[in-house]
Amino acid sequence: MSSQSHPDGLSGRDQPVELLNPARVNHMPSTVDVATALPLQVAPTAVPMDLRLDHQFSLPLEPALREQQLQQELLALKQKQQIQRQILIAEFQRQHEQLSRQHEAQLHEHIKQQQEMLAMKHQQELLEHQRKLERHRQEQELEKQHREQKLQQLKNKEKGKESAVASTEVKMKLQEFVLNKKKALAHRNLNHCISSDPRYWYGKTQHSSLDQSSPPQSGVSASYNHPVLGMYDAKDDFPLRKTASEPNLKLRSRLKQKVAERRSSPLLRRKDGPVATALKKRPLDVTDSACSSAPGSGPSSPNSSSGNVSTENGIAPTVPSAPAETSLAHRLVTREGSVAPLPLYTSPSLPNITLGLPATGPAAGAAGQQDAERLALPALQQRILFPGTHLTPYLSTSPLERDGAAAHNPLLQHMVLLEQPPTQTPLVTGLGALPLHSQSLVGADRVSPSIHKLRQHRPLGRTQSAPLPQNAQALQHLVIQQQHQQFLEKHKQQFQQQQLHLSKIISKPSEPPRQPESHPEETEEELREHQALLDEPYLDRLPGQKEPSLAGVQVKQEPIESEEEEAEATRETEPGQRPATEQELLFRQQALLLEQQRIHQLRNYQASMEAAGIPVSFGSHRPLSRAQSSPASATFPMSVQEPPTKPRFTTGLVYDTLMLKHQCTCGNTNSHPEHAGRIQSIWSRLQETGLRGKCECIRGRKATLEELQTVHSEAHTLLYGTNPLNRQKLDSSLTSVFVRLPCGGVGVDSDTIWNEVHSSGAARLAVGCVVELVFKVATGELKNGFAVVRPPGHHAEESTPMGFCYFNSVAVAAKLLQQRLNVSKILIVDWDVHHGNGTQQAFYNDPNVLYMSLHRYDDGNFFPGSGAPDEVGTGPGVGFNVNMAFTGGLEPPMGDAEYLAAFRTVVMPIANEFAPDVVLVSSGFDAVEGHPTPLGGYNLSAKCFGYLTKQLMGLAGGRLVLALEGGHDLTAICDASEACVSALLGNELEPLPEKVLHQRPNANAVHSMEKVMDIHSKYWRCLQRLSSTVGHSLIEAQKCEKEEAETVTAMASLSVGVKPAEKRSEEEPMEEEPPL
C-alpha cells in the first residue's frame, strides 16, 4: 500500500482535518464545541465508521506515529480554536463600539433638539412679554390721551354749553350779588354779633397752646368798628393779616411757631402756608343765635345744604382724630415713597357708583373764604342758639384736613340760609335758650360740628418746653393723654359753675346755698341708665301731670302740636296752682338740662376715645340726679325712672349720632354723596312731623367681630372693624387697600371714603343698630321698624368693600336670625336702584332666604353690573334669588306704574307663596325722582314707597324691618322715609294720583317683567296665571282680579244634585287656577 507524501508528514488519505479558508472562518458560529473535534471523545453516532481494510491493519503497525499524529492534530485544533475565539472577541468589540457610537450620537442629537425647543419656547415667552408690555404701554398712552382730550374739551368748552363746573365769571357774579345784597346788613350788625366778654375768649375759643401767654388773636377785634365788607383784589395785601395794634416782631414770632407746627407733618407742602394760616384765626362767639329751616320751607323740607356734619354736643371729632389720621397718611407715604398713583378698586364689572358725576369746582381762595365767613355772621343775629353751641370756623387739625382747606364754606352757607325764628326768653340765665318753635328742620342733633364748641377745651398743641415726639404713635399717646386730662379738668370746673348757679336760683331764701357735690365722672352703666333721659321727653314721665298741660315745653326739642294747643293748655291750668306748678316744672327742667348736657359730653368723649383705641373708664360715682348732695334734691325729690324693660308694641326707630362721624377727612361733603347729612335730615324730618314721638326709639350698639364674621371674612372684619392700633398688627399687604383720594382724603375707592378713627366704629354701629331692631321685631317686642343708619351695606361682599359699604347690615341680621332664633324663612327685599351684589352673594345657595331685588340693570351697564334675571341661585338655593332687573335705560325712566306692576306680578306673588317668617328690606331711596343719572335716574315718587311698604306689611304677620341703604338727594330721602314710617305706623296714606293709577307700564318694563316671569315660572307656579296682566295698569289689574274673583264665586255657588255638598267644594276650581 503506497501513500503519498504530505507537507505535514501525513498521507492525504489519513488526514481527518482540513484547513479553514478565510471565507469559512467568517461564517463560523460564535461558539465552538471542542468535543466534536476529538475523535476519542465523540459519541459513535457522531462520526461515521471507517470500513477501510488498510486502515485496520495499519493501526497496530504504527502506534507511535498515530499517537504523534493525534497530538499534532489536537495542537492544531487548539490553535485554530484560539484564533477563532480572538476573531469573535474582536468582532464583538467592534460591534459594541459601533453601537456605542451610534447611541452617543443619538443622545447628542436628542439633547440638541431639546435645547433648541427650550430656546424657542423661551424666545416665544420673551416675545409675548414684550407684546404685553407694548400693549400695556399703548393702553396707558391711550388713556392718557383720552384724559388730556377730556381736560382739553373742558378747557375749550363754549360758553353756551352746559357744564357742572361753574366758570370764574359766574362765581364772581354770584359773589358780587351776595356781597351787594348783604353789605348794609353786615355793616350795621357785625359789631353786635361779636362777644366782647373776655370770659368767652378763654372758655369757648380754640387756640394753640403756644399762645397760652397771650390773649387770643381773632381775625377781627371786638373793640373797633370794622370796614364794610367788599371785594379784595388778589394783588392787595391780605386784609386780615394782623391788627393795627399788633407789632411786627410778635407777628413774625407767631408765624414761625405756626410754620414749625405745620412742618411736623410729612404730608404738608410748604406752599399751603397762607391758606392754613388763614384758617387758624380765632373763632367768633355768638350767644343769641339759632338755626331753622330755609325760608319758605315747611316741616317737610330737608336742609338745603349738605354741609360738613361731624358731631354734636360739643365734642369735635377732629381733635382726637388728628394723630390717627396723620399716622395713616404717614404709612401711605412711607410705603411707596409717594401717595399718588395708587390703583383704585373698581366694582366686579363696572366702575364706581359715582362715575359720571359733575366735577366739583376748585376750592376758593383764602380771601373768598374770609368773605364767606364774615357774610354768615350778620345772618345769625337776634336768633336763639341751642344750649352749648356757638359758631366757630372749621379748623383743620390734621394734614389731610388741611389739604381741603375750603371745607368750612358749606357750613357758613348753611348758616346764612337759616330762617330767623321768633325770639324766646331763656329759661335760665347763662344756659342758653330752649327752642320752642315748631317749624324747624334742623334740631339740636342736626347742628353742624362748628356750632357745638361752646364750653370745650382748647385744641391740643405742644408747649415750647415739650420735646418733639419721635414717631406718630408717640404723638398720638401724648395728644390723647393731654386731651383726657384737660377734658376732665374743664368738665369739672364747668359742672361746678353750673351747679352753683342753679343752686342760687332754686334755693329757698331761708336756706343758705350749699356747695354742690360734683361728680364729673360716670360709669358706663350709669350712662346707659340715663339714656332714657336723652331719647324721650322728660315731661312724659312726670307723675301727676296732665299731658296737654305740658305739651308746650319740651327739653329735647320735640315739636309741639300747634300754638293753639299750647294756648289751650295754658288756659286749662287752674289759676291757683299755676305759679307753683310752673315754678316746680321750671326747676325740674333746669336740673334735667344740666344733667343731659353733662351726660352728652361724657358719652361722646368716651365714644371718641374708644374709637381711637384708648379705653376710658370713669369712677363709679352715683348719678348726680340721685345724690342727696345735689342742689336739685334740696328743693324737690329728683326721681329718675329706669328705662322700661319692654318697649311699646309699635314701630321701632334706631339712630345714633356716632354714625355722623364717618366722613372724609377733606371735610367737603359736596364731593361725597354719602355724607352725614343724609341720616341727620331724615331724623329731623321724623321729629318735626311728629312720627318720631309715635315710635319707640331703641338704643343701638356696635356689632361684635363674631357677628360680622357670619357674613364677612376674618381679615375683612379685622381690617375694617377694628381701631388703628389693631390694624397696625395686620399684614402690610392687607392695609395696602387704602389709597389717597383726589379730594385729599383716604378711601378704598373713589366712592368709599375711610376715616381712620370713626369709620370702623360707625360701620359696626350701623350693623349693630339693624341687628337690635330686627331681633326686637322678630321676638315680638316691636311691631315693625325703620333703621336710620349709615354707612349702607348691601354692596359689601365677603371680603370687598365697595359702593359706600363696608359691612352688610341686612345680611348679618338675617344670618343671626337663622343662628340664634332658628328662623326658617326670611325674605329680603332690596328696592335700592343699585343691585345688592353683597346680599346676593351671601345667600346665593341658601333655600331658607329668598332675596328679591328691584334695580336698574340695563344689560349690565349700570353699577355694579350684577343682578341679571338669569342669576337664580345655585345648589339648593336655585329659584330663591329673584332679580327684577329693569332694562332699557332712561327712555323712558321707570316710575310708579312700573314698580307697582312689578310688585303686583312678581314680588308679592312669589313672597306669598314663600310665606316668610320675617321680612327685611334694604330700603334705598335713590330710585326717587331727583337723583342724577349716575346715581339713579328713575322717577319714582315718595308716596309709592309708602304703598310698597304697606303691601309688605301683609307678610310674616307684619314683622317687617326697613334698613336705610342708598339715596343721596335730601328732599327725596326725607319724603320717602316719612312715607315708609307713616305706613309702618298704620296711618292712612295719601292717595296716588289718578294718572299713576291709569298709567300702564312702559314697554321696557313689560319686557323685563316678562323675562323674569319666564325664567322663574319653573320655580314659582303663581307666576303662570299672571303673565297676561303684566301690561295692565293698576286699575285694569284690580278690575281683572275682581272679575276673576266673581267668576270663582259664581262657580263655587253652582250645585249638582247627584253630588253631595261636601264633595262639591273639593272639586270646585281654586282661586289660583285660571277661570273657566
Curated annotation (Swiss-Prot):
Residues 132-166, 205-225, 239-323, 506-529, 541-580, 622-645 are annotated as: Disordered. The gene is Hdac4. It catalyses: N(6)-acetyl-L-lysyl-[histone] + H2O = L-lysyl-[histone] + acetate. It comes from Mus musculus (Mouse). Residues 205-224, 626-638 have a biased composition (Polar residues). A motif (Nuclear export signal) lies at residues 1043-1076. It holds the Pfam family Hist_deacetyl. This is Histone deacetylase 4. InterPro entries: HDAC4/5/7/9, His_deacetylse, His_deacetylse_dom, His_deacetylse_dom_sf, Hist_deacetylase_Gln_rich_N, Ureohydrolase_dom_sf. A motif (PxLPxI/L motif) lies at residues 348-353.
